[in-house]
Amino acid sequence: MTTAKPPPASEAYRSQAGHYDRRTDAFRQWRELLVASLPLRPGDTVLDVGCGTGLCAPLLHRQVGPAGTIIGIDESEQMLAVAAHRVTEHGWDNVRLIAAPVATAPIDGMADAALFCAVHDIMQSRAALDNILAHLRPGSPVAATGGKQPAPWMWPLRPWVIRLHRPFITDFTGFDRPWRLLAKHVPDLQVRELAFTAGYLAVGYTPGVRQMRKPMTNKAKQSLTKRAMRKHARGHSVPTRALLSGY
């Protein structure tokens, strides 16, 4: 007897693009935490990897301003159509949307930062990470957040977490440590677990020194992450509510 493989996550995103924002509204606290962990400056160019409907764009635009550039990448044309409507509605002329798999997305020039918000399949793709990291300047901040397999001592949560994320993840390989491949590109990657170990925030910098800025010490990087955590995730109440919505 053979078991049918689950449909790729891209089908779920395609079918749910119209109401994706409503379904993931509770997850906004994680998005805020993610963007707050990036030391963005006005005028920066940031890569929003697997941007979906563009829910991170307002937060990013607030940081980089009209002089900055936001490049959203997603292979779902249905999700990007919603993102394009959001961009038009806000009148942003500095947001570029690329409809392509992240591994082969044609990214022009170099960016100053990248974020990965609830994109497990992309985080497990070496080719996707290679393409993104190849377009980041030395010393660029990188941040990722999403769900993960709860720790063994939280085993009652495991079936529930898997069921919650199954529509949006094609392959659960690496779900115990979703950041493992990213850590190979970002040697100083720091990881904090969220939602009773069922979620995570990973923040680090690409190797090298970022130009036109005094490089941050490890102590300063740790302080930045801790401040973001205290501001957006006091206790476990916020991440737990966010977890209810899945991606």
Which functions belong to the PLM regions below?
Residues 1-39, 160-165:
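Conserved class I S-adenosyl-L-methionine
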Residues 47-49, 53-103:
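Class I SAM-dependent methyltransferase SAM/SAH-binding core
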Residues 103-114:
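A short acidic, Gly/Pro-enriched loop at the edge of an enzyme's catalytic core
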Residues 113-126:
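A short SAM/SAH-binding and catalytic strip from SAM-dependent methyltransferases
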Residues 128-138:
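A short glycine-rich, Lys/Arg-flanked "PGG" loop and its adjoining helix->strand segment in the class I
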Residues 139-147:
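Conserved beta-strand signature within the Rossmann-like core of class I S-adenosyl-L-methionine
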Residues 169-185:
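Short alpha-helix
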Residues 187-215:
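Core SAM-dependent methyltransferase catalytic element
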